[in-house]
Design a protein with these regions (language model features):
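Glycine/proline-enriched, intrinsically flexible loops and inter-domain linkers
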Residues: 1-554, 567-578, 700, 704, ...
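Short amphipathic alpha-helical segments
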Residues: 69, 504-505, 557-560, 601-603, ...
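Short, basic, glycine/proline-bearing loop/turn elements
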Residues: 255, 335-337, 557-566, 682-683, ...
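Amide-donor transfer/coupling interface in amidating biosynthetic enzymes
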Residues: 424, 529-530, 535, 578-579, ...
Length: 733
């Protein structure tokens, strides 16, 4: 498809006039052809209304039908709305009349020349932001106050609402360590490839301190860039490869020269640091409308740093081992508190080399909460302790030393490290933080860190805890297909909202299967009829059906998986499904959204497509009432299913989950029946391998900690955990 696209642009603010208007010098746009979400829009509204999740593409006239055909295959709406013309004019036609007809030369002037007076206020030395950090007197109070600060506190309840493992290429999960409590500063993922493997990764981080920017927009921009670069360096990236993009947001400027001074100072700072570090900003977005009545936003320039590297060079921030040493790597600053850029590049380059040599065990860029924030968050993930040196000053504990990085190194590597550092402490086995005669327990620190946003973005729902004793089911025989196939065919149906088909297909192909994916097209009646026929044919040609995860039809109507189940109840499709299972000894698998479809169809636990009854097992909203995305432990508790043939009975596996409706609910009688029949495939377990109702492990509150179930003979398996999202260098933290 990409080979016939000559140019493309995504829709956003400005709508048609911008997304299409930027594609060529000469254009005639037919606004009547533009798809509308609702009726009643006039020509101006059609031309400038913001629209999302649309793309404008340019193709050769001879390729139009081909492109429209590709779009139809993917169940995408595509229409011809404009033509490129030789005459350099932008023409917008509505209801047979030209409502806009402007020369490109005029548009390229960017409007009339305008000037304004600008006055930049020099930041007050008396109110120097860096000097305003006072030496804490009560260390324990300062420690806990720092961790509970809104700029430092845990955002786990918010982060888990977003799918962090889709694509099976997430190198570092948002929270790392055994307890998944050390926040990752840099988003790292492998490049998505449909075929083959890659060790190439992308890295992305950000930097911004609104309080620093309020004191000095110039310094705010400088340290936004430096902080974003420091986080990349701490993760193992080569800072010299970074490219930047800025997000700017300022108060309404009007004609006040001093108000204009803020964005000018911010941009001057951003320019200075770009020149100093040799790192260009190649994208961004800005807004000058940050005023409501007498309320103004702080001067805002957020720096996003993007880099490329190999996953073999990645370092994660959670502390690794007791006995290791903690050191701080500082950067030089001049008399105006501006980083010495040559030193920044030198230090980060040294760090990159030592990371590649394997000398750095973990690293964390110092942020808003100083050393206290850095060492605490590094310790949380594996619940190791930190003993700080007496030589660390009280002020250093809370100093906002942006650009500095805390490193964990082996004691044996310290003298030969080759980086100018100062020792600040060591990692201890006992989960406590100590500084001189002050001790903060891990529980105290975590309580302070997690409490701030718990009511807004909860991580617990206080579901009653009950003990679960269910044991293992050791089947004497496992169903074996009579039809031997060297390369089984797998059919993966794709519905609107499905997003796991690529991961699922790759997993099956790695295992040696021949995979066919078909998109269910529901935009027209004919599309539905054709899809039904295509699905029926694909099922008849296959030995396995795999229902992938996602959010089919946005989890509507009335619950997830229902759209898929409705489609598969079609007589043609359901007949072929039952033939596959009953006549050809086929298999079926459903993961996440696919499990929801299987259970609504009746394929689990009944083994056949049949209506649900009032007491049928089902999947419902997570007990916490929101989407959950994290890693969980699941235990294989039966060997009855062919799907579990290579799994160890009683074995515990770490897999990602990502769902909002994954809570398995069934009556006591049904649950006892499923366990007795060996139909409970997997259960959520704690770190000791015990099934649990503790929602730290049983994230959705499933009854009896059930994660997956099978049909009576084990050939149909439904489970919530994304077993397909596996791969080399995935979730390394």
């Amino acid at each position: 498809v990409s080979s016939i696209i000559k140019k493309c642009n995504d829709f956003g603010a400005g709508g048609v006039s911008v997304a299409i208007g930027e594609l060529a010098d000469g254009l005639v746009v037919d606004l009547d052809k533009v798809p509308k979400k609702y009726a009643g829009l006039d020509g101006t509204e059609l031309a400038i209304s913001e629209s999302q999740e649309r793309m404008a593409i340019v193709v050769d006239p001879k390729d139009v039908d081909t492109m429209l055909g590709y779009a139809e295959e993917e169940n995408l709406e595509a229409v011809v709305v404009a033509k490129v013309t030789e005459e350099p004019r932008l023409v917008l036609n509505w209801r047979g009349k030209d409502i806009v007809n402007i020369s490109r030369a005029f548009l390229n002037t960017n409007g009339a020349h305008q000037e304004t007076q600008v006055k930049v206020e020099v930041p007050s030395k008396a109110d120097n932001y860096f000097d305003s950090v006072k030496e804490p007197q009560d260390i324990k109070k300062a420690w806990l106050d720092t961790l509970s600060d809104l700029n430092v506190c845990s955002q786990k309840g918010l982060v888990e609402m977003f799918d962090s493992s889709i694509g099976a290429g997430t190198v570092t999960m948002p929270y790392g360590g055994k307890y998944q409590l050390t926040p990752t500063q840099t988003m790292i993922a492998k490049l998505p490839v449909l075929k083959g493997k890659t060790d190439t990764i992308t890295m992305m981080s950000y930097g911004f301190d609104p309080y620093l920017s309020s004191w000095s927009p110039y310094h705010g921009s400088v340290y936004a860039v430096v902080t974003s670069a420091a986080k990349i360096a701490a993760a193992g990236g080569d800072v010299s490869k970074i490219r930047l993009t800025f997000q700017e947001y300022f108060k309404r400027l009007g004609t006040d020269p001093y108000r204009w001074g803020q964005p000018l100072a911010a941009l001057l700072g951003a320019y200075d640091v770009q020149i100093g570090l040799g790192l260009p900003s190649i994208g961004g977005k800005d807004s000058m409308s940050g005023t409501f009545n007498d309320i103004d936003v702080p001067p805002t320039l957020v720096s996003f740093a993007v880099d490329v590297a190999s996953y073999m060079d990645v370092v994660t921030p959670e502390l690794k081992k007791a006995g290791n040493v903690l050191v701080e790597m500082d950067i030089d600053k001049d008399e105006n508190d501006i980083p010495v850029y040559e030193n920044v590049l030198y230090m980060y380059d040294l760090l990159n080399k030592k990371i590649k040599e394997g000398k750095i065990q973990s690293a964390y860029a110092v942020g808003f909460g100083g050393i206290i924030e850095a060492v605490s968050k590094m310790a949380f993930g594996n619940k190791l302790g930190v003993e700080l040196e007496d030589t660390v000053s009280r002020r250093d504990l809370v100093a906002k030393n942006y650009g500095s990085i805390i490193l964990e190194v082996k004691a044996s590597d310290l003298d030969q490290l080759g980086i100018p550092v100062k020792k600040i402490g060591k990692v201890t086995k006992e989960p406590v933080f100590t500084y001189k005669d002050v001790t903060i327990t891990m529980d105290e620190a975590l309580a302070a860190w997690t409490k701030t946003l718990e009511k807004v973005f909860p991580t617990e729902s206080n579901v009653p805890q009950t003990e679960i004793k269910t044991g293992l089911f050791d089947a004497k025989t496992v169903y074996t297909s009579r039809n031997k196939v060297a390369k089984p065919k797998v059919f993966i149906p794709v519905f609107p909202g499905t997003n796991c088909e690529y991961d699922s297909a790759k997993a099956f192909e790695r295992a040696g299967a021949d995979v066919q994916t078909i998109v269910f097209r529901n935009m027209t009646a004919q599309g539905i009829r054709d899809s039904v026929d295509a699905f029926a044919k694909a099922i008849s040609d296959s030995q396995i059906i795999m229902f992938p995860g996602g959010f089919s039809a946005g989890d509507e109507p009335d619950g997830s998986g229902k759209f898929i189940a409705t489609a598969f109840r079609n007589a043609k499709i359901s007949e072929e499904v039952m033939k596959l299972l009953n006549e050809r000894d086929g298999l079926a698998l459903g993961i996440c959204n696919g499990f929801q479809a299987l259970i609504k169809l009746g394929l689990v636990p009944y083994g056949e497509i049949r209506p649900q009854t009032d007491d049928s097992p089902t999947l419902t909203m997570n007990s916490i009432g929101r989407h959950q995305s994290k890693m969980v432990y699941t235990k294989v508790v039966t060997n009855k299913s062919p799907w579990l043939k290579k799994a160890e009975l009683g074995g515990v596996y770490t897999i990602p989950i990502s769902h909002g409706e994954g809570r398995f609910v069934a009556s006591k009688e049904w649950c006892e029946k499923l366990f007795a029949n060996g139909q409970v495939a997997t259960q959520y377990v704690d770190m000791n391998g015990n099934p649990t109702m503790d929602e730290y492990y049983n994230v959705n509150g499933s009854y009896y900690a059930i994660e997956g179930i099978t049909s009576p003979d084990g050939r149909v398996l439904g489970k919530m955990g994304h077993s397909e999202r596996i791969g080399q260098a995935v979730a390394v933290n």
